[in-house]
Amino acid sequence: MKVRPSVKKMCEKCRVIKRHGKIMVICQNPKHKQRQG
């Protein structure tokens, strides 16, 4: 899980979602998981 100020899709499989008021990226590739900090 990467925590960064701006989250971007890293591939076509990435999905940007909102959980508990936080913007997150979920993907089949676990390296692409991100959360806005």
UniProtKB/Swiss-Prot annotation:
GO MF: structural constituent of ribosome
Main subcellular location: plastid
InterPro entries: Ribosomal_bL36, Ribosomal_bL36_sp
Biological processes per GO annotation: translation
One GO CC term on file: ribonucleoprotein complex
The keyword Ribosomal protein is annotated on this UniProt entry: yes
Keywords: Chloroplast, Plastid, Ribonucleoprotein, Ribosomal protein
NCBIfam families the UniProt entry points to: rpmJ_bact (TIGR01022)
Family: Belongs to the bacterial ribosomal protein bL36 family.
Designated name of the protein: Large ribosomal subunit protein bL36c
The species this protein was found in: Thalassiosira pseudonana
